[in-house]
Amino acid sequence: LWLLILLCGKLAVAQDHMYSQFFNSPVYLNPALNGQFQGDLRMNLIYRNQFTSVPGGFNYLTASVDYNIPQFGGGIGLIFTRGNEGTAGLTKNNIAGIYSYSVGSDDFVLSFGVQAGVTNRTVDYGKLVFSDQIDPRLGYIPGSPTNAESPRFDNRFYFDAGAGVNLALSDFNIGGALQHINRPNESFTGTPAKLPMRGTAHVSYRWDLNKDENLDEDEKSFFIPSVVFYKQSTAQSINIGLQYKRHNLNAGLWVRTAGSGGPSAITFSLIFDLFLNKESGEKFRLGVSHDAPISGLNYSNTSGTTEGSIGYETTLPSRTDAYHKFEGARRCYDFY
């Protein structure tokens, strides 16, 4: 019953998933972060298994690739996101292109990004259980008929767009994004059901723990506190936490609140950077995190939420001597 109520809520008022490892899905967080990295080519993959022990599952995956264009400090990119929710197989696939551009100096970088793509949303109504299929004594009988009216659609395509902005200034990084700005219609029934816009705001501070200013950047240690705020229709959440970054290790502790009555959680994250060739900037990033609910949901019933991520970044041989804008400025990638 709990799962059916949750699924019905998803059908009635769609709500985007958000990743606890937002720093390992930067393009999903904000399209203005597209092309904002040290190398030439970056690829990210992140998977979220939400409420692990709930039947049907809530599973999400995002894959992105972005290409840094040094002449204007931005880039072009492509992002694919897939979500599968509940026993009825409510599935959403989105693919979008991203373009970003930056202005600034050796003291700051202000980036702008736009995103546009196509979403396909499907549901298998044959897997739903209605009240007239439940026997008072025997419960649900598989294959029993129902008088529930069939929907007009079980498959829907629509255009979707978003935009974002990000500012890296000194030891601060602050940004915001707005998704679904065209309010696409997601309805399966024919009655309009416009997808609410999703607003995101994020801010981070990089606290240098080193007394020796002559240390190389890779040898330093940092505390990086961050706040991420999401709002979509009446749903909202605030993610507050701290990362400790040293050498190839990045460890984090986060608290997420979801408003009155919503599920709150504590998140632990651990990230490893594996440098294959430091001179060329080639590296792998491996990340894992786990959310443990502290209110709204019972951990023993859900088993929490687990995420895994993989990132790869490299410099292309043909561009090793390419000119990069804003060489002296702090960049957004310095904050994760």
Placement of each model-derived feature along the sequence:
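Outer-membrane beta-barrel translocator/channel fold
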Residues: 15-28, 32-33, 41, 48-57, ...
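Sec-dependent N-terminal signal peptides
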Residues: 1-9
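Active-site-proximal flexible loops/turns
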Residues: 37, 124, 187
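Transmembrane beta-strand segments of outer-membrane beta-barrel domains in Gram-negative
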Residues: 43, 56-59, 133-179, 185-191, ...
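Detector for outer-membrane/organellar transmembrane beta-barrel domains
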Residues: 162-184, 192-247, 252-256
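Sec/Tat signal peptide C-region and signal peptidase I cleavage site
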Residues: 10-14
